[in-house]
Amino acid sequence: MRVNITLACTECGERNYISTKNKRNNPDRVEFKKYCPRDKKSTLHRETK
C-alpha cells in the first residue's frame, strides 16, 4: 500500500517535495538528499507527517 508523504528540509524546515512510499518496505521515516531552493544547495530532506 503506497501512501503520500511530504519531504521537509532539515536545515530550513521548508516542505519542498511530495512523494509516495511503500509502508511495507519502508516502515521508518525516509531521508533523501535533495535540492532546497531556499538554501540554494542540496540538503537532507526527511519525511514529515
Curated annotation (Swiss-Prot):
**Which sequence ranges form a coiled-coil region, renumbered to this chain?**
none
PROSITE patterns per the UniProt record, alphabetical: RIBOSOMAL_L33
Q: Name one GO molecular function term.
A: structural constituent of ribosome
Where are stretches of biased composition, namely Basic and acidic residues? Answer: 25-49
> Region Disordered: which residues?
21-49
N-terminal signal peptide = none
Q: What would be one Gene Ontology cellular-component term for the protein?
A: cytoplasm
Transmembrane intervals: none
What are the UniProt keywords, alphabetically? Ribonucleoprotein, Ribosomal protein
Question: Please, which domain of life does this record's source organism belong to?
Answer: Bacteria
Q: Which InterPro entries match?
A: Ribosomal_bL33 (IPR001705), Ribosomal_bL33_CS (IPR018264), Ribosomal_bL33_sf (IPR038584), Ribosomal_zn-bd (IPR011332)
Instruction: Give a single Pfam family match.
Output: Ribosomal_L33
The reply to whether Signal figures as a keyword in the UniProt entry is no
Ribonucleoprotein found in the keyword field: yes
GO biological processes = translation
Family, per entry? Belongs to the bacterial ribosomal protein bL33 family.
Q: What is this protein called?
A: Large ribosomal subunit protein bL33C
Instruction: Please report the organism this UniProt entry assigns to the protein.
Output: Bacillus licheniformis (strain ATCC 14580 / DSM 13 / JCM 2505 / CCUG 7422 / NBRC 12200 / NCIMB 9375 / NCTC 10341 / NRRL NRS-1264 / Gibson 46)
